[in-house]
Amino acid sequence: LLGGGANSVAVYKDLVAVAIEASDPQAPGLVAFYDSTDLSLVGTADVGAMPDMLTFTPNGRYVLVANEGEPDDDYSIDPEGSISIIDLRHGVASANVRTADFNAWDGMEETLRAAGVRIFGPGASTSEDLEPEYITVANNSRTAWVVMQEANALAVVDIKRATVTDILPLGTKDHSLPGNELDASNRDDAINITSWPVKGYYMPDAIASYNIDDETYIVSANEGDSRDYDGFSEEARIKDLVLDPGAFPNAATLQLDENLGRLNSTTVNGDTDGDGDYDELYSYGARSFSIWSSEGELVYDSGADFENITAAALPDEFNSNNDENGSLDSRSDDKGPEPEGIALGKIRGHIFAFIGLERIGGVMVYDITNPYNVQYITYVNNRDFSVDAQLPNGTTNPLVGDLGPEGLVFIPAAKSPNGEPLLVTGNDVSGTTTVFQINIE
């Protein structure tokens, strides 16, 4: 195997592209191209540090690579994040690599922070701090949107010019509002989905896009993520923060373990007046999926659906972890069901979103044909909570079903081996791949 490990795979016709990080993760990586008919190596292209995800443009002319550029553990080396654009119009042998970087935004850190972009690595410039995670491309192959998860922002990329044209902050979700409730504690051994004075950063992992009435919409799985390194960590439990008495007169009650005390928060944001205590509280991820305009405006969010639906469907397993059965409520203090993967598919004129829940497992299905009138369809989870998730030797019990869905792929009926639309899930913890046939009633 080339380099230090394969992070992402994409296929266009007979060409397979694989993103491979270097043995030294902070060094530049590469993309290897293979012939799908015999898996022979066709060629390679050098890209940025830690290529985390790649995708072909719909027309197959380019491969776009999200170079995450994470720092090393002591934060002594923090490579720049970037997007590599590999031009394949003249074949792999003549592939030309250009880089859409964030250098033009260096020196604008305070402006970006004021707009809501989280730039907070110790001493980091914009280029060093932004970590491209996932890419979606417009149907016309001209524009890409790239999520920077920890920064809670999207980058807009002009593919032909290989230029980042905008950085769009995604804002926060107010969990004190009706419809945005969450369960914030893993120490009450109960389902308690309620309103709290907390704002959740959307922080998507996977994103996808679709076109309706000549408008592109971005769909995000709002997983959430923090920075937690030996050299720098932003994580703190709310009970360990000093809360402003004016903003939180009931701080002592809020900070009890059974209330907000256990919820993971950040030390980076929330001290709005710089006096050393916290005037606002933030959490990681929104426990939902969202639809955004191409300009980054929120069009739809699923609110508290995921926790409410899983609580009703699996009341004894609510907010379980993905490697242990009988772990009721164990993820409530972190990111709840943790939506991570997303795929979109068109069936009989309707656009459906399939969202994988990394922790409790399963897939949420919504009809998003009208982004302003989204309809919940169903929740499917084949996990067997009645057996041990792990065998005595530490391996996954093959009887447990799927654990930790991460990657999702929709196969339309026209390309399906059985002529029916299919959904494929890659499940990280169980190491399983599952194919679901989608039946429309």
Listing of model-derived features with the role each one plays in the protein:
Residues 1-441:
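Beta-sheet-rich non-transmembrane sensory/scaffold domains
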